[in-house]
Structures are given as C-alpha cells and as structure tokens.
C-alpha cells in the first residue's frame, strides 16, 4: 500500500519549506495566548506559547530531518536526533538477562552471613568473602548503608550489624570503633525519623543486635538512651501481638525477620522453608536459621546468594517476580514498551509459570504472597491476554471488608493499595471482588491524600503523591496512552527511587536512568513529528474551507489530539491522519445534512456522487464545484485519493454505509472510525470477510452503543453547570459501566477468531469517547498542550 503519510506530507508546503506566516501558525485553543515566528528563510523555527502569562518554550518544528522506514520525512527536534538504538539494546539485554533479578547488596544481611561460624569447627567465618565485603564497604563517616540517601533506620541497622559481625571475629577494631561512634552520634535521630520509612522489622532486629553487641562486650554503645528505650518499648508491644502459634503453622511475614525473635520451634519452622532453602527469601533470616539448625538447604541458599553477589547478600533474593513486573510497568507507563515486546512476553511467561491461586511474592515459589506483587501481576497479565482469576485478591480481604498488603500488617501503605486500585479497573462483568477492591482503594487513597499521609513504607519516591493524585483523577478508561506517558516521564525518578526492605535497596530493572532517557528522547522524536503533522492538518483545514461548516480550529486540534494521544508511534501517520480527518469530514457532512436548506434530494445526490467514485479505479474529481455538499464531497474524495486502490475501495464502502445511516438519521461515527483505523492499519487488507465475522460485529455493535451513550453525556456536559452535574451522574450509569466491562473483556481476552490488534482499535476509540465525556474542557486543553506542544524537560 502506498504510504498516505508520504503522499500528504510531500504535498504539504510545510514539507517543502514554503510556509507562509499565516498558514504556519500553530493555532491553540482559546485558553492559550499564542505567538509564533515562522519565516521560510529561518534555519531554526522558534516557537513559544504563553499559558497563564507564563512563557513556555515549545519543541522546535523546523529541525533536522531524518527519514522513517516508510519513506516519510520526519522532523526531529535537535535533542531527539541522537541515536536511540544503544539504550534500546541495553534495555533489551537487561530484560533478557534478568534471571533471579538484580538488586543492591544489604550490609545488614551480609553481616548476618559473615557471623556464621566455620562448619568444620575452625575458628573463623564460614564465608570470609562476606566479612571482607563489610570491611571494604564502610562509608567515610563510619557507617554502613545507602551512600546517596540518608535514612536513620537504614544507617543504624546496617551499622550495628556490621559492627557486631566484625567484633564477632575480633578484626578491624578501628572500623568497629568508628561504627560505634557513628551509632552514638546518630541514635537520637530515631526520635525524628519518619515512621513510614522505618526499615522492615527494625523495631525487632535492632534491639536484638544491641543485645548481641552487649554480649560481645562492645562498650560505649547507647544501650540506655531514650531513643533506644523507645525502640525496646515498641518491640515489646509488637512481640505481644505476634501470634507465635500461627507463625509456626502457616507462612507469615514473620519468617522474614526470624533473627529478631525468641523461643522459636525450629522443627515446625523448617516445614515452612521455601523450596530454594530460604525463609521468605531473606538471607539474614536464613543465616540465623542455619546458625540454629545447620540445615543443608539453608546453607545452599546462602552459598548460592553470596556467590552471585561476590560475598555480599541483598535483603531479599530472588527478586525475579518483582523485578520483571515493575520493569514492564515502568516501560509501559513511560511509553516505550513497544520496543521490547518479545522481552515483555518472555517476562510475563515467567510470571505466569509461577502464578498461584494465592497470588505471588517478590520471589518465585513462595507460599507467602502479598497484594502488591499480586495486583501488579494480575493487571499486567490480564492486559496481555492471560486468563487470570481476580478472586485471588480475596486472599487479602479482611473480615471488615478492608484489603491489606498481607495478614498482620500494622501500617497500611499507599503504594500497594494504589496498585490494587489500578488492577481493579480492568474489570470484566460480574467480578464483584474488583468492585469491592476499587471502592476500598479509592476511599483509602483519597483519605491518605486529604490527610497528607502519603509517605510510603516500601518506596521513597518524590512524586508518588502526584502519581496517586493523578491516578485518582484520571482512571484507566479515561486515560489516553500519550497523556499517561507525558505525566509519568515527569514523575519517574529513575535511579532516584529507593526501595525500603530490611535496608534501603535499589533495583536497576525498575529504577533506571536509561529508561528515563529513552522515554524522553522517544517522546521528543514523536512530538516533533506530531507538530509537523499538525502544520499539515492546519493547511488542509484552510484549503478545504472547513471553517464554513462551523468547525473551528479547536475542533480540528481536538480531533488530531485524540488520534495522536491514542496512536502516537512514528510509523503510524496513516492511522493518525485518517482518524483526525475522518472525524472532521464526518462533521462536515453531518453539518450539511442538518442544514434546513438541505433537501432530501441534495442528500441523495451526495450519496450518489460517492457511488460514482470507483474505489478500484482513479477517482473522477466528483464534487469539485458547487455548494457545501460539493465541498464536503470534494474533501472526502481528496481524502480517499491518498490511498492505494484497494484501501480506497474498502474506505469508500465504509463511508457509503455511514452516509446511508446518516440519511436515515442514525449515523454511527464510532463504527466508521474503527473500520477506518483497521483498514488504514492494513489489518483487514484483502480479508473483507472479517467485517462480517461474528466477533467483529459484536465488538462493533457494543462499541457503537457505548459511544452513543458517551456522546449523549458529552452533549449534556456542554449545557453548562447543570449539564456537567448530569454528565457526572450519567457516566456512572450501571448499564454503561457493564458495557465498558464487556468491551474490555472482549478486547483483552485472547480467545476469539480475530487478531487482537483489530480488537484494540475498538477499545482505543471507545476510550477517546469516554475520555471526552469524563474530563472537563480545561483538563483536556491542558492535556493537549502537554502532549503536543510542551517540551520534555
């Protein structure tokens, strides 16, 4: 098929660099004050916009050109020209070699491994490489812990553990002394620390290590300081609540911190050991268990772990489930997942292999599962067509109706509940557990935001509150891919995000600056092309006299934005332009049909003229002279001329059906749009029987029904304040919700006889209708600016 993008852009004066100042202005909605300077002789086209009187620079349009693989001339911003293949290849390699997951070493866990005595009875450590790791990794201030981010809980628990390990073997007394000094000077900071950032089990393991230090004769530690006494008090209160009988029977989170507990029945606990020999993937807990039991499986887990990390031990291992799930999530939200589809498929296959009816944990084959990993896994697998039973979430629903990350959780944190909220939105009909989850999660998160209690116990992320706030304001059905990507590029901190376990830790599969750099580069490249296409769309608007039909430039911008925010890829110009033009041409013809002066004879004449266009032969210039009807037909004819013969034939048939419907007062814009997208994408080329397939017809009928309801709601919204109130009520209509759930089910499930890419077009179109009905006009204006014009920082 000849490239429509090549045809339309080569005809454009913008492409030929003969742009007049009048036709080249990037017209913005009335809410923006716009100024542009575009001269045909300028080498660098400078554009700027003022939003609320604040000057904002805009990605340049007149920039170096590169040629896309389809032959289209693509404008690139200067910063976006740099090669993206290297970061893509780096990320592909990262995903392909994930293995058990990449994670930073924990001094705390390494110290517990270093404390293990030689199994042959010699006077020395069984794992001297772990002791050496401690020696080599003391920080300049005498502490151990995350060097880039200070967290008092992390620094103190790491430092006391390393001090105890060194003293256990009476080595490096000067390092022990420096560590003790650090603890003395910083222990009072515990009184000021954020409770939400307390490392896992700190109140249990820190006192246990102090007792161990005292038994080793380490003097000068602040054993009796008020801060330490407060930790002891919290420990006593927690231990009173620990159901020791239950923890010996079923896997609980307490298996993660056995080294801080007393009076344990090891015969019972060994029955709860994971298949890999660990206790809930924790090297420190497993090291303590080995000290008490000399269990061979514990030993093998510890040895395998330190061999992997050159003597060090992370706070948890493996992290194969956690690493893969969050990597996919980050790549999707950043808008760059399309570069890694085979790798993502492999990652999800790995997750599916270890999925259970209890859910999943951060590491595979764990009997203990949590709501965070389970929610993320359920959502991502469902999005990719896996059959996942949402009733797995019942494992985390308490008797009072609340959901918890895991049983016995003391402080519920925002991030796991936010992932529950996100998962709950991919609901199929009849899935009441997801309705319960959505209601609970929404209320929980709203309350956290209202009370400014958004600090998280699992991750330190600067923009987490912004992310959650936006997620509540913009649910999945009312989110368009490029809008989500633009915001997430703004919020994603890359390596700046730090995770909280027993210690602070980092994971390159999740928090990676290369992800961020690639996302920004890709967005700039796409945005530059979108701006170039917008220039062409404005010229088309002028040359076709579209304004005469009561269609404003803002209407044109909205149509182009909806298309671009949904299908943004560089190579999909054909579909974007066809989407935007089809919406505008349909408005033109509808305007002509609705005029009081338009007779039935005029309507039939237009339909007959369309019939004179033979899709398998050259068009005959129908309708190039005359009034509004002729102008509308000429615009449609010109649109069809941009395609090869067979595509033109298919599109003409789609428009003929739509015009016949319009003549009878029941035009189906959504059907026209989805058919146009699938035709232009080549999904049904030479396979017209797909249009008659039962599944295709079911999708088409359901999408049309949904879009008609949403169009009515949109009309209500435009009637002022009362209309907006009515629209908010209407969009929560039970029938509409159930129809959307059914559409999501039909599109996402792998079952059926038609390609998923064909089905995705129906959901993409329906989501744009939902988006318009859901959001206020000012919000949409903001999104248009961010996606099309605001440069990536």
Swiss-Prot record:
GO BP, sorted A to Z: gibberellin biosynthetic process
A cellular-component GO term for this protein: chloroplast
Keyword line: Chloroplast, Isomerase, Magnesium, Metal-binding, Plastid, Transit peptide
Binding-site list for substrate: 238, 457
Motif (DXDD motif): 370-373
UniProt domain comment: The Asp-Xaa-Asp-Asp (DXDD) motif is important for the catalytic activity, presumably through binding to Mg(2+).
Protein name: Copalyl diphosphate synthase CPS1, chloroplastic
Organism in which the protein naturally occurs: Salvia miltiorrhiza
Record lineage: Eukaryota, Viridiplantae, Streptophyta, Embryophyta, Tracheophyta
């Amino acid at each position: 098929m000849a490239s429509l993008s090549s045809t339309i852009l080569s005809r454009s004066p913008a492409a030929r660099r003969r742009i007049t100042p009048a036709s080249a202005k990037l017209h913005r909605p009335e809410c923006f004050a716009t100024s542009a300077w575009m001269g045909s002789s300028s080498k660098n086209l400078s554009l700027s916009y003022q939003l609320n009187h604040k000057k904002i620079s805009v990605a340049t349009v007149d920039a170096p050109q590169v040629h896309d693989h389809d032959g289209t001339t693509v404008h690139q911003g200067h910063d976006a020209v740099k090669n993206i293949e290297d970061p893509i290849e780096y990320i592909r390699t990262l995903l392909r070699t994930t293995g058990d997951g990449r994670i930073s070493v924990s001094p705390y866990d390494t110290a517990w491994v270093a404390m293990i005595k030689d199994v042959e009875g010699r006077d020395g450590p069984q794992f001297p490489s772990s002791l050496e790791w401690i020696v080599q990794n003391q920080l300049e201030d005498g502490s151990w812990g995350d060097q880039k981010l200070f967290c008092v809980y992390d620094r103190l628990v790491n430092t006391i553990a390393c001090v105890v390990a060194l003293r256990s073997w009476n080595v490096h007394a000067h390092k022990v002394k420096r560590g003790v000094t650090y603890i003395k000077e910083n222990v009072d900071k515990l009184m000021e620390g954020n409770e939400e950032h307390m490392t896992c089990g700190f109140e249990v393991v820190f006192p246990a290590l102090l007792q161990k230090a005292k038994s080793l004769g380490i003097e000068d530690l602040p054993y009796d300081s008020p801060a330490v006494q407060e930790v002891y008090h919290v420990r006593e209160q927690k231990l009173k609540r620990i159901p020791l009988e239950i923890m010996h029977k079923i896997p609980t989170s307490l298996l993660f911190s056995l080294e801080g507990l007393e009076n344990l029945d090891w015969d019972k606990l060994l029955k709860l050991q994971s298949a890999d020999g660990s206790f809930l993937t924790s090297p420190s807990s497993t090291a303590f268990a080995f000290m008490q039991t000399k269990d061979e499986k514990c030993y093998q887990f510890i040895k395998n772990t330190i061999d992997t990390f050159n003597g060090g031990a992370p706070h948890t291992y493996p992290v194969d489930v956690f690493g893969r799930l969050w990597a996919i999530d980050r790549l999707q939200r950043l808008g760059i997942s399309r570069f890694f589809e085979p790798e993502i498929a492999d990652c999800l296959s790995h997750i599916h292999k270890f999925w259970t009816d209890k859910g999943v944990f951060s590491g595979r084959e764990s009997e203990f599962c949590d709501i965070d990993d389970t929610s993320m896994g359920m959502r991502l697998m469902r999005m990719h067509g896996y059959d996942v039973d949402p009733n797995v979430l019942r494992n985390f629903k308490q008797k009072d109706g609340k959901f918890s990350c895991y049983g016995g959780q003391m402080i519920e944190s925002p991030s796991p509940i936010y992932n529950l909220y996100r998962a709950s939105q991919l609901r199929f009909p009849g899935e009441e557990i997801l309705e319960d989850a959505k209601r609970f999660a929404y209320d929980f998160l709203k309350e956290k935001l209202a009370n400014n209690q958004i600090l998280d116990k699992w991750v330190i992320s600067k923009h987490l509150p912004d992310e959650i706030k936006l997620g509540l304001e913009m649910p999945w059905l009312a989110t368009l891919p490029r809008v989500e990507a633009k915001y997430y590029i703004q919020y994603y901190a890359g390596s700046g995000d730090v995770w909280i376990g027993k210690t602070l830790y980092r994971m390159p599969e999740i928090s990676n600056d290369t992800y961020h750099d690639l996302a920004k580069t890709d967005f700039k490249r796409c945005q530059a092309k979108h701006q170039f296409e917008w220039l062409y769309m404005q010229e088309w608007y002028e040359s076709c006299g579209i304004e005469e039909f009561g269609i404003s430039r803002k209407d044109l911008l909205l149509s182009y934005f909806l298309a671009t925010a949904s299908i943004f890829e560089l190579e999909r110009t054909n579909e974007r332009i066809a989407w935007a033009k089809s919406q505008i041409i349909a408005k033109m013809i509808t305007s002509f049909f609705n005029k009081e002066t338009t007779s039935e004879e005029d309507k039939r004449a237009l339909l007959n003229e369309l019939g004179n266009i033979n899709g398998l032969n050259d068009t005959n210039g129908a309708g190039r002279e005359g009034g509004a009807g002729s102008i509308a037909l000429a615009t449609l004819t010109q649109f069809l001329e941009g395609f090869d013969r067979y595509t033109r034939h298919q599109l003409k048939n789609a428009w003929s059906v739509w015009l016949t419907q319009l003549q009878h007062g029941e035009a189906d814009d959504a059907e026209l749009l989805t058919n146009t997208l699938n035709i232009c994408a080549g999904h049904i080329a030479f396979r017209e029987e797909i249009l008659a397939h039962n599944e295709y017809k079911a999708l088409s009928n359901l999408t049309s029904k949904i879009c008609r309801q949403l169009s009515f709601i949109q009309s209500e919204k435009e009637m002022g304040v009362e209309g907006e109130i009515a629209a908010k009520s209407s969009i929560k209509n039970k029938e509409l919700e159930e129809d959307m759930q059914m559409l999501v089910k039909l599109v996402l499930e792998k079952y059926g006889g038609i390609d998923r890419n064909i089905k995705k077009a129906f959901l993409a179109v329906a989501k744009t209708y939902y988006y318009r009905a859901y959001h206020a006009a000012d919000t949409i204006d903001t999104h248009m600016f961010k996606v099309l014009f605001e440069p990536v920082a």
